[in-house]
UniProtKB/Swiss-Prot annotation:
EC identifiers of the protein: 2.1.2.10
Classification via NCBIfam families: gcvT, PRK00389.1
Gene3D superfamilies, A to Z: Aminomethyltransferase beta-barrel domains (3.30.70.1400), Aminomethyltransferase fragment (4.10.1250.10), Probable tRNA modification gtpase trme, domain 1 (3.30.1360.120)
Keyword Nuclease: no
HAMAP family reported in the protein's UniProt record: GcvT
Disulphide connectivity of cysteines: none
Keywords assigned by UniProt, alphabetized: Aminotransferase, Transferase
Species annotation: Desulforamulus reducens (strain ATCC BAA-1160 / DSM 100696 / MI-1) (Desulfotomaculum reducens)
Gene Ontology terms describing biological process: glycine decarboxylation via glycine cleavage system
Full protein name: Aminomethyltransferase
Matches recorded under Pfam families: GCV_T, GCV_T_C
Subunit-level organization: The glycine cleavage system is composed of four proteins: P, T, L and H.
Amino acid sequence: MQELKRTPLYNIHLAAGAKMVEFGGWLMPVQYEGIIAEHQAVRSAAGLFDVSHMGEIQISGPTAREFVQRLVTNDISRLKPGCAIYSPMCNPQGGTVDDLLVYQLEDQQYLLVVNASNTDKDFHWIVSQQVPGVEIQNVSEVTCQLALQGPQAEKILQRLTAVDLSHIKSFCFVYGAVEGIHCLISRTGYTGEAGFELYFPASHAERVWQAIMATGATDGLRPVGLGARDTLRFEACLALYGHELTDDISPLMAGLGWTVKFNKPEFVGKEPLLKQKEAGTTYQLVGLEMIDRGIPRQGYAIFKEGQEVGWITSGTFAPTLGKNMGLGYVEIPFADVGKELNIMVRNKPLKARIVKKPFYKREV
């Protein structure tokens, strides 16, 4: 059996009393004081996440722009150094290899931030597409990534850097020192809240983590594990690979059509996606609120009048709403907001209602 990987903050998590679990080949903190308390801290104050298990793949060289443009479905020609874009990366059949962030570091240099469980798969896929004039490096092991999220995030981080954080727009980044350590400071996140993601050498992980935690102590900052990271992204209806997106699920089916730019001359998966767009998808990703008591879990079947019409991709108790909610794929004729369906929970058909997504949106 392959030994589980550890982030540079493994000992910090143990000292903080974290409950550690296996996730995508890593030993990661699922919670510290508790998922609901950590979730509420991010919504009301701030939370600090160790996301060093995420993958970082650097692409550079004279043809890097054209290469990345063909690799992903979104249009990176609009990017300039200091900006980032969210995009799916598709296979030739139009299914999703992964969803990722593309950072433009320099004129012909990009950083692709991919999902932890997909890092090796993605790296090998990208290398298999390699063309002359492109260098591809997996820099995941030498990179620490932290996410500071929540309404107090900017106030907390500002105490540790001379960079004016208020000038960083959404999906943009700057380079600057945090606690004296050179970082890429990005206004991005995966929680539905305002916040930042920091990238810097893994050797400085403990120093930066401890400085942020100490600085934010009086503002309600809490360390946050993967459990609350999932409930936060779930309330914001942000896709999680392996759930809402897979090798067999296209970005169009997942409601991510806005990230697929058909006006680009070429990208992997373009032809099947174009056919799918013209014909329409069979299923639609919907939000579900439980009427009966129960939590819908991934893989549970969805029925309408005894006919199976879909399946659940994610489901949990949503702490901000105080309700049991789900995300799932439902056949188009049954996917209208307000429609009632049945979800098979432990062999019992429980009532649920289709509701608008996202379940939570931060008030600006």
